[in-house]
Amino acid sequence: MGILKRKLTSFQIILLGFAGVILLGAFLLTLPISSKTHEWTSFIDALFTSTSAVCVTGLIVFDTATHWTIFGQIVILLLIQIGGMGVVTIALSLAVISGKKIGLFSRETMKNAISAPNVSGMVRLTGFIIKGIFLIELIGALVMMPVFCIDYGAEGVWFAIFHSVSAFCNAGFDIMGTKSGEFTSITHYSAQPIINITIMLLIIIGGIGFLVWEDICKHKWRIREYRTQSKVVLIVTAALIVLPAIYFFFFEFGDLPVGDRIFTSLFQSITPRTAGFNTVNLTAISDTGLYLMIILMLIGGSPGSTAGGMKTTTVAVLFSSAFSVFRKKDNAELVKRRIDDETVKTASAIFIMYISLFLFGGMTISAIEKLPITSCLYEAASAVGTVGLTLGITPTLGIVSKLILILSMFFGRVGGLTLIYAAFGANKKQVAKLPTDTIAVG
């Protein structure tokens, strides 16, 4: 990193880091050793799978269990882990372990990678993140292991590890294809409380963000001492779990027993915000339910987490900005704090970028493939939100449509602002201010 810092910005290093890992993963997945047919996998399909894994999405063109060998599955799991932790986080951790001095540029890069407010305590925070990730994934695997081992014997150990990492990293990849049928996700365990609860908790913990973890561990139940961002994340996350779950409970899964209905409703309200697992056949959900899931997929998780999407805080800032207009206030306000105008402008830019890419991707795929617009918009939202839920059209798409989804997944993981800052730089000073004028809106 010392050589690169003289030529590249921190945003460019983040961008190139993800791109490099994706290309390496694609190369490994093309090899005959990765495929159960022992034949070369086409580069576009290997690139799609690698991008989906590194960008912790979960959209696939092949069933993970039936197409990929154990070598291929290990490659995919490592790509998921790298993508979830972040390339920069891993690089900084290795540097610390090797005893290298961590300079200001490296700390700045890490700050941008995890959306931290400043570079203070970055090395300590990195250690906290790494330890936390492996501890939580280990606990998740140990909890699920007895269930999987009862069903699959010794193979259940691998099932527990794979699904724990995939759930925590909000990836949504599964290896159930050889047991319950291709592309079935974890529908076989829709009524199994241990698997359901564990995966839901892993998704939530992975999706709330590393800075929120730090506040929870440091301040415990003293919520008043949490960062403003942590308070907003927890409030919005709770709302986005409870409200959709109520809708699913009353309007989508009325034919299920009450216990199964509660689990299924909660699971389907949690998983669209970038996880990608499903316990029901998604094609059986109404159009209203599908569009609700599209909204959840676009919102995604929280800053500095393993999740993608435009982020919970972005939506909170936009809503608070709108309410400030309704109430004739000068500034947006959240949890008794004023939100500066720069944050509101940034949130607006992120919202426009995600919505534009989502609409462009969905409409273009629909036009090219001659498929229903709802299915294509669902797939586009799943890609740009790095979710992985699908109505089953991804394996049938042509090369151009796959490339659109690949670019959408990459955009969704690294973030729109990272791409813009990598290309054009950040915080450029405005030389002169133009005259102010008014434009009628609304």
Feature map (PLM): residue ranges:
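Membrane-proximal intracellular helices of multi-pass ion channels
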Residues: M1-G442
